[in-house]
Amino acid sequence: MSIAEPRRSGSDHGDLTDRILDAARRLVLRTGARKLSLSDVATLAGVSRPTIYRYFVSKEDLIDALGKHEYRRFKAALDVAMSGVTGVARLEAAVDVVATFVEDQPPGRLLDLEPGFAHEQMAQALPMMTEGLMVVLQQCAREDGFATAVVPRDLAGAIARTGLSHYIFPDTDPAAARRQIRAAAGLPGS
């Protein structure tokens, strides 16, 4: 049985799972997924190695859960940013979340450490980001007539791909990613 999506019977379990996943994320960014050790994750999370195994049956399960955790963080950030806004303001909020996630990633670090793993992670992230943005674009169109000649899926894909391209090819100007992601969405720079 895989425990990639650990059962959470209480907030302590959720908090501990988050601590473990946060520790794993920091270590993956520091040393890469191949060198990730469950012992190091346990030490950084402040738990015993057997505790890690109560939540994740293997390193692969932990890495899989880490990808799902990052998507949940992205989705939660989208939900918070778009709360109480409609139309184009909703799109601006969503695009700014994408830009913030790109800005928060150490540029190319994982790509330098493990290109295959980084490519796999981005290949998994692209359809999830595209789907999330497509839903936003459809909501925007229903709310205040946000009109574009572009098919929502194509526009969402362009926004997501622009964001991911900045992870692969970081710009020396830290504000460039946000400007270009907003431009891909047809929004003025911020």
Task: Please describe what each predicted stretch is.
Residues 20-28, 70, 74, 78, ...:
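Short hydrophobic clusters on alpha-helical segments that form packing/core surfaces
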Residues 45-56:
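Short hydrophobic/aromatic patch on the recognition helix
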Residues 65, 79-104, 118, 155-156:
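Hydrophobic alpha-helical connector segments
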Residues 75, 118-157:
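Amphipathic alpha-helical packing segments from all-alpha helical-bundle domains
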Residues 88-113, 123-128, 138:
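Helical hydrophobic small-molecule/effector-binding pocket
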Residues 100-104, 139, 157-176, 186-190:
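Amphipathic C-terminal alpha-helical segment
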